Regions:
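TOPRIM fold recognition
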Residues: 34-38, 43, 47-134
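Phosphate-handling DNA/RNA-contact segment within nucleic-acid enzymes
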Residues: 1-23, 29, 56
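Alpha-helix N-cap/helix-start capping motif
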Residues: 28-29, 50
Length: 134
């Protein structure tokens, strides 16, 4: 089976491996559930916790020197991502956006919740292109 886009899986695996030591910031509970579904086992932190982004960023930077940022891909998610990048960077926090950037550049999904579906779709297309059915 040849994947149309093996880089999606490579980057997912790399992010999941990093997540064993580096927390991932996501917008909400459904995003946490989606990442758990595709094998993320590390610390996943919900952004929407009833505090301002300024206070949230300060709390994160106090506790972590590196983070992976994985907000939704819609306008609101992009706005949150941009704001947190500015805030966290100002506190000296290193931000990894590799997985987010790749998905946003190559796929038309709107939320982190869609990532398991996207990965299944890419796998399914690879299987179907080889004449196999599942």
């Amino acid at each position: 089976m040849e994947l149309k886009d093996p880089e999606l899986f490579t980057l997912k695996d790399r992010a999941a491996e990093m997540n064993l030591n580096v927390p991932i910031l996501v917008e909400g509970k459904h995003d946490v559930d989606a990442l758990r579904e595709i094998g993320f086992r590390g610390h996943l932190i919900k952004i929407n916790r009833g505090v301002s982004l300024d206070l949230f960023a300060e709390m994160i930077a106090r506790n972590f020197r590196k983070i992976i940022l994985l907000t939704d891909f819609d306008r609101k998610g992009q706005s949150i991502k941009t704001r947190l990048q500015v805030l966290l960077s100002s506190y000296g926090c290193e931000i990894n956006l590799e997985f987010w950037d790749f998905i946003n550049r190559n796929y038309k999904i709107k939320s982190v919740e869609d990532i398991p579906w996207l990965m299944e779709k890419v796998l399914s297309e690879a299987t179907n292109s080889n004449g196999k059915r599942h």
